[in-house]
Amino acid sequence: MIGTCYLHTVIDDYSRVAYVEAHDDETKETATQVLRNAVAWFAERGVTVQRVLSDNGSCYKSHLWHQTCTDLGITPKKTRPYRPQTNGKIERFHRTLADGWAYARCYTSEAERRGELDGWLHYYNHHRPHTACGNQPPFSRLINVPGQYI
């Protein structure tokens, strides 16, 4: 039986490089830890997070979320309620993710499906052509990755 999975997604607005974690919940504690992990992951790739645009879920309205953003030097912004178009990049990515990973084949378990996520994300970020990137993969737009020119 396939279980419930909450995908916490962070996408760089310029490059479209995606960071995703699959969790069993969408609590404020989980959301803030994902944000911390994503900020560190992007920093390792030469990207400094300055702003974060989130929907209006309760975890993103919490004091903990705002305090975490302050601690990380990030300005939190919210989408307009009931207007998913405000966060169109994430919405479109989730459709691509659903088609290319979540429902691309029959998985025998949620654990098996989650186990395939990192491989699919690598493909998406490093190999899959993206129209917003001139039919290059998102990672091709990151030009200051530490160690890239050594």
Predicted regions and their residues:
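A structural motif
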Residues: 8-10, 89-96
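Distinct, well-ordered alpha-helical segments
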Residues: 65-66
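Mobile-element integrase/transposase regions
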Residues: 1-11, 17, 33, 150
